[in-house]
């Protein structure tokens, strides 16, 4: 039975001698071994720690020799085993949590002198090939180098597979639970599987130059909400992003250049951590009202088909308000939870896409819509010119929930 992880062996005598441990783990293969003998059955179990420099490894007897297990962070792939003799703490990290739990269970049995129900190894040196699983970065930039029959190393944190002609995301990639950066640029991928959202540590996702036409709602509801920091969707065929896209609130860098975008998500202002936004060479006619809420360091909207602000507003006021409109406003104003298990799905969609008045209230189908220009420097420190004439202004939509709000805010439309 073996476990691949990082190991640090700390002597508990060091503090008494005024010494400090170096504080850094090394990549190792841990083996649960038994010493075999022809005359008697194997009864002694050992923990063998092998590293790339010491393939024969260092062994520690386990039977009645474990003082304590520290497993508070076992779900994060971390644990510590304290031995009696020698007086050392074996600190384990960067392990697959399920494998670590099984390995620790086997060590407990060995400590008690019980039979281990899983296969155990003999005391033999570890092969160099086993350390290939510790690679944290792999870059593949051609079809001929792409592995067809061999799995990706489980410990990968950075994987790039560009110019490989991929038409779909390889399911083997979705088993890399330590992955932090995934670069699938310059392929032919048309659709993203929802299981990408299971990569709980994924911080950077590069899908530049593919054939994507959409970004799924399932990904917006996944663990990417808490992990994803950078997303590159440039050079695809995306026309619109779902309103749920704005739930990816950890995003800091978003690239949407060279798509077919006709609008931003209406709630884009909810991306409170967004600092770099690039959406050059799309088909944006105007910006949504919540665009004003962004606080960017860099903004590039060059080459979009921005329209001139309309002189006359679009009036869609209802008098009196319908029951649907009144109920929707009440639900949103009071932040009452809703979902498809409570109300029909199409009503959930209506609530998700509700407009926000300049006064902060919500409106569904009863509103006044006006368009004005906004200097992009009001939301970004650095602004790329929006056209060849040196402009830094773009049209932005404003909504008003009532005639009173429109009259009181009419100066902003001049």
Swiss-Prot record:
GO terms for cellular component: cytosol; nucleus. InterPro entries: Leu-rich_rpt, Leu-rich_rpt_4, Leu-rich_rpt_typical-subtyp, LRR_dom_sf, LRR_domain-containing. Transmembrane segments: none annotated. GO terms for biological process: intracellular signal transduction; protein ubiquitination. Pathway: Protein modification; protein ubiquitination. Gene3D superfamilies: Ribonuclease Inhibitor (3.80.10.10). It is found in: Nucleus. Ubiquitous. Maximal expression was seen in the heart and skeletal muscle and minimal expression seen in the kidney. SMART domains: LRR_TYP. Keywords: Leucine-rich repeat, Nucleus, Repeat, Ubl conjugation pathway. LRR repeats lie at residues 155-176, 178-199, 201-222, 227-248, 250-271, 273-294, 295-316. Pfam families: LRR_1 (PF00560), LRR_4 (PF12799), PH_LRR1 (PF25344). Component of the probable ECS(LRR1) E3 ubiquitin-protein ligase complex which contains CUL2, RBX1, Elongin BC complex and LRR1. Interacts with CUL2, RBX1, ELOB and ELOC. Substrate recognition subunit of an ECS (Elongin BC-CUL2/5-SOCS-box protein) E3 ubiquitin-protein ligase complex which mediates the ubiquitination and subsequent proteasomal degradation of target proteins. ECS(LRR1) ubiquitinates MCM7 and promotes CMG replisome disassembly by VCP and chromatin extraction during S-phase. May negatively regulate the 4-1BB-mediated signaling cascades which result in the activation of NK-kappaB and JNK1. This is Leucine-rich repeat protein 1. It comes from Homo sapiens. The lineage of its organism: Eukaryota, Metazoa, Chordata, Craniata, Vertebrata.
């Amino acid at each position: 039975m073996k476990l691949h992880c990082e190991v640090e062996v700390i002597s508990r005598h060091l503090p008494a001698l005024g010494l400090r441990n170096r504080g850094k783990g090394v990549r190792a293969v841990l083996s649960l071994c038994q010493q075999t003998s022809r005359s008697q059955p194997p009864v002694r179990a050992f923990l063998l720690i092998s590293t790339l420099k010491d393939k024969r490894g260092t062994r520690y007897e386990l039977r009645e020799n474990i003082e304590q297990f520290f497993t508070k962070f076992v779900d994060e792939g971390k644990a510590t085993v304290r031995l009696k003799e020698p007086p050392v703490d074996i600190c384990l990290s960067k392990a697959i949590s399920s494998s670590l739990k099984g390995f620790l269970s086997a060590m407990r049995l060995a400590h008690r002198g019980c039979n281990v129900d899983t296969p155990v190894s003999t005391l033999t040196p570890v092969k160099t090939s086993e350390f290939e699983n510790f690679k944290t970065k792999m870059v593949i930039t051609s079809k001929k180098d792409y592995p067809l029959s061999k799995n990706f190393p489980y410990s990968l944190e950075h994987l790039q597979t560009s110019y490989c002609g991929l038409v779909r995301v390889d399911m083997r990639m979705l088993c890399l639970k330590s992955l932090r950066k995934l670069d699938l640029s310059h392929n032919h991928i048309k659709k993203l599987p929802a299981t990408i959202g299971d990569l709980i540590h994924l911080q950077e996702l590069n899908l530049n130059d593919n054939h994507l036409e959409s970004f799924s709602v399932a990904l917006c509801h996944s663990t990417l909400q808490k992990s994803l920091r950078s997303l590159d969707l440039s050079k695809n065929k995306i026309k619109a992003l779902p309103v749920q896209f704005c739930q990816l609130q950890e995003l800091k860098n978003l690239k949407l250049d060279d798509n077919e975008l006709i609008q931003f998500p209406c709630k884009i202002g909810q991306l409170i951590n967004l600092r770099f936004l690039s959406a050059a060479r799309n088909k944006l006619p105007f910006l949504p009202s919540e665009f004003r809420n962004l606080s960017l360091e860099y903004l590039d909207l060059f080459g979009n088909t921005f329209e001139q602000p309309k002189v006359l507003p679009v009036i869609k006021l209802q008098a009196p308000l319908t029951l649907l409109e009144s109920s929707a406003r009440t639900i949103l104003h009071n932040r009452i939870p809703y979902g498809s298990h409570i109300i029909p799905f199409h009503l959930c969609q209506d609530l998700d896409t509700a407009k926000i008045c300049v006064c902060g209230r919500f409106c569904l189908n009863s509103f006044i819509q006006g368009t004005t220009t906004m200097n992009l420097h009001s939301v970004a420190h650095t602004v790329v010119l929006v056209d060849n004439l040196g402009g830094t202004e773009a049209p932005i939509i404003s909504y008003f929930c009532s005639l009173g709000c429109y009259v009181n805010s009419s100066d902003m439309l001049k």
